[in-house]
Amino acid sequence: MSQFPSSAIFTVSRLNQTVRQLLEMEMGQIWLSGEISNLSQPSSGHWYFTLKDERAQVRCAMFRTSNRRVTFRPQNGQQVLIRATITLYEPRGDYQLLAESMQPAGDGLLQQQFEQLKQKLAAEGLFDQQFKQVLPSPAKQVGVITSASGAALHDILQVLQRRDPSLPVIVYPTSVQGADAPLQIVRAIELANQREECDVLIVGRGGGSLEDLWSFNDERVARAIFASRIPIVSAVGHETDVTIADFVGDLRAPTPSAAAELVSRNQLELLRQIQSQRQRLEMAMDYYLAQRNREFTRLHHRLQQQHPQLRLARQQAQLVKLRQRLDDAMQQQLRQTLRRSERLQQRLMQQQPQTRIHRAQQRLQQLSYQMQSAVERQLNQNKQKLGIACSRLEGVSPLATLARGYNVTTAPDGKVLKNVTQITPGETLKTRLQDGWVESQVTTLVPNPSSVKKRRKPSSQS
């Protein structure tokens, strides 16, 4: 078996480290476009995702310090363009990219620019409803700003011819796609305002991709539409297409054909309206005549009611009613006076001195009885409390202890004696018994042997 020099043998760690250094030094930073998949955004703030195309994929990471500068929220399936460094994660030997910047690619970039311009113009108030102009009804002359060769112009003219052939139309031809298109659209709007030939404008084109419709997302076009003194109907693309011009315009039409219907009158509808107005006029006339007939009948009846004989009869009936009301009022007043007199008499009877004295005597007797009962209850409670206190006092009295055969001996200075060490032979002591005092003189002291042993100290060893 042949021997290899030790320097030619790699460990796994050394191999991964060498490959990482080669990738980072040789490749450096690169730009890479692809579709995002497996996007993960954990609580750490870092992003982990895969970039793929139809044939391959590569793992990517974007740390929090880098992704905080990204101006949009990435989504799975979104095409993006990233600037990244190629590296290798040594512990697992995984090859990956460390992204430092990210931006949308293709339509994604256009969509981001669309949202940014939309927010800017909305903040300036260009979309506010208060600035929207009302379309004339009916329009006297319509202006169309679109491509002269596009299908949108053909659709608009066809609808106008069908609905209102007598409506004049002025076309302001312009490019609707390409780098020069926004400026041409702006000039066409300004020209229409200078000539003042039309009282409403249709600005639009047929359908297409987001990039095809981009001229109508241009800020210059938006500001020209906002500044127009002539009301503008925005008609760009299909119903699902939305542009900045739709937000700024005075009215949005889903298609160019729909815009033509909005600014024109339908002849058949006009005929139906005329017929309807005629029917309403006839009905109004019939109603008016019927009202006048009813008014005549009412006045004739009132004239008959104003005959002098009828008026006299009504006044006599009214006089009878008034007389009856007067009698009723006098009877009511008399009854009220009688009831008031009875109430005053009852109150006078209640206020007589004898009645008040009798009630006061009854109240005094009741209070006297209550006071006597309260005093007796209080005396009984105090007697019970005194008896309990005396019993407790006798239980702790020294005299009670003496009655059981005990006595208390005191020294000449009055101090109570507890042991023989406090006594000196020859002293005169006082002993308190239950029924008196005894004075005695000490001749002999006889200590308790057990107490002497307790007080004796142990002898030291020689």
Swiss-Prot record:
Its EC number(s): 3.1.11.6
Q: Name one GO cellular component term.
A: exodeoxyribonuclease VII complex
List the GO molecular function terms: exodeoxyribonuclease VII activity; nucleic acid binding
Name the coiled-coil region(s): none
Q: Where in the cell is it found?
A: Cytoplasm
Query: What domain of life does the native source organism fall in?
Result: Bacteria
Which InterPro entries does this chain map to?
Exonuc_VII_L, Exonuc_VII_lsu_C, OB-fold_nuc-bd_dom
Q: Which GO terms describe its biological process?
A: DNA catabolic process
Q: Which family does it belong to?
A: Belongs to the XseA family.
**Stated role:** Bidirectionally degrades single-stranded DNA into large acid-insoluble oligonucleotides, which are then degraded further into small acid-soluble oligonucleotides.
According to the record's subunit comment, the protein's assembly and interactions are:
Heterooligomer composed of large and small subunits.
Q: Which PANTHER family match?
A: EXODEOXYRIBONUCLEASE 7 LARGE SUBUNIT
Question: This chain belongs to which protein, by name?
Answer: Exodeoxyribonuclease 7 large subunit
The gene designation is: xseA
